[in-house]
C-alpha cells in the first residue's frame, strides 16, 4: 500500500498572464525582504545557541487558504516543512474559528505533519479589516524537548515517546493573550525550561513583526493589488518550473543509495527512488526503500516532501521562488511502513541523516537528465554530533566533525561541509566555551583519513575538525546519530573528470 501525495494545483487551469512582470518581480522581492527581516529577528533575539549561532530555523508567509507565499529558508530541509504544519493547523482549526491575536503551535510528525520533535512550529494569523488574509510562520530547532537523552536526538531510540514532548496542533495564544499554563506545561517537559520559554516567546514575537510588515504592505499597495500579486507570483513559479520540466527527457530513472544501518546496527538500509518525468509532472516513487527502521532514522512523510522540493529546486532552478507554485507539478509516493514513510509510533529524531541520503538519491536519479555542469558527485551525507550536558555551566555544548560535499565539474571536493539538506551553521568555538564550558584545543579545516583521493585544498573550512575537552562539564555525554554512508571502507577511489 502506498501513500500518494499531490499538492492540489490552485492555478492549473490557466496559463499565467502577467500584466506587469516587472512589478511582480518587485513584489516577490518585497515578500522575501519581509521573510529575511523575520529570519534576522528570530536569529538575533533567540537565546539558545542552536538558533542564534547555528541558525537552525526558517520563516514563511502563507495566504488564508494555506498556500505558501514566500519562505526564507536557512535550512533546505525546511522547504515544505512549514507547509505541513500549516495544513495541520487548518485541518484542526477551520478558518471561521481563527481569531485575530491567536497563535498556534505544533511539532508532532504524526499528529501535525511535523519533521521531528525538536522542530517547533509557531503560526500566527494576519487579519485585515477583520478578515483573515495571511499567516506568518516560523520553525526553529530547540536544543532540547525532553525525552530519553539530552538534545532529544539519538539514533538508537526506538519510539517517538522516547524523543520528547509531542505537541499536536493547538492554540498557545487567544485574542492576544498567551496561554501561560500551556506554555509552562510544554517547557516543564524539557531540560532547560527557562530557555524554552524565552525561545518560544521570540518565535511568537517574530511572527508579530512579520504580520505587521504584511499589513504595512497591504496598507501601501491595497488589498486587491496584494492578493492579485500573490496569485501572479505563485502562477509564475509554477509555469517556470513546468518550463524546466518540459526540457527534460520523458521516462523513468531509478537510483539507489544505502544507509549503513537503521540506527540499531545490522545490514545497510536501501534508499531507492524512481523519478518519472512527463510533460507537466515529476513523480517520485520510493518503492524499494528499506523497511521502517528500528531506531530513529525514519523519515516522516512530510520531511520526505521537503527533501523532494529542495532537490528539484536545487537541480532545475535554484533561483525559483519558494512558494506553492513549486509544489504543484510534483507528486510523490512511498510505501507505508518503510524508512521513507514510517508508521506511528516509529522514532524519527535522527531523520536528518536519512533526509540527506534521500536528497542524494534524488540527485542521482537526475544524473542522466542534466548536463555535466549541473550534476554532483555523491556527498558525505552524514550528521554526527556529540552532546554534553550538565548542571553547570549550561550543558549541551554540541559540536560536529563534518565530512565532504561531492565534487562538481570544475569545482574541487569541499571538506568540512554538510552534503545536502542540513545546512545549519557550526557553533563558534567562543560560543561553545562561553555557554557550555567546552574546552576546544584545536579547530581547523583539515580532516584526517578522508575517504577517496580528494584533498581539502583551498576549500578547507575552519570547522572541519575540532578537538574538545569535555572534562569541565558534568553529567551526561551523549553520542549523537552517526550515519557515515560508507563505513570505514571509504567511498571508492574516485576518478578525474
Q: Which residue stretches match the model-derived regions?
A:
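Glycine/proline-enriched, intrinsically flexible loops and inter-domain linkers
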Residues: 2-100, 105-128, 132-283, 287-497
